Regions:
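N-terminal, charge-rich alpha-helical recognition modules
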Residues: 1-72, 76, 87
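Amphipathic alpha-helical protein-protein interaction segments
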Residues: 66-109
Length: 109
């Protein structure tokens, strides 16, 4: 192996470990904003992508359990958005679309 291959392997291992940490943080109740900050992602969607990559590497039974847990969180989030008295209707609609995108990504194979 040459130095470039070694660096690529290390980077891939680091990426896998970072994805796994995103999954652990989210499963532990952290928001995707908090996960992104903790892991140095520039955007929240990068933390969500990492979470989903790690989830898909888990055994089928564990994936199902993690998906149920995440869907419950997303349902609570959607309920909170709908119940908010402080958000404008456009903001409610935008946030609910975001929650729906998160659901779609979570359930994608």
């Amino acid at each position: 192996m040459d130095a470039v291959t070694d660096r690529s392997d290390i980077r891939a291992e680091d990426d896998l470990a970072r994805d796994d940490k995103a999954l652990r943080l989210r499963a532990g109740g952290r928001s995707f904003v908090a996960v992104a900050k903790a892991l140095g992602y520039g955007r929240t969607h990068q933390a969500n992508d990492a979470f989903n990559r790690a989830l898909r590497r888990k055994p089928a039974g564990e994936q199902e359990s993690l998906r149920r847990q995440e869907l419950a969180r997303l349902n609570i989030l959607a309920e909170d958005v709908r119940a908010s008295q402080q958000l404008e209707p456009d903001d409610v609609a935008r946030r609910l679309r975001t929650v729906e995108r998160l659901r779609v990504m979570l359930l994608a194979e």
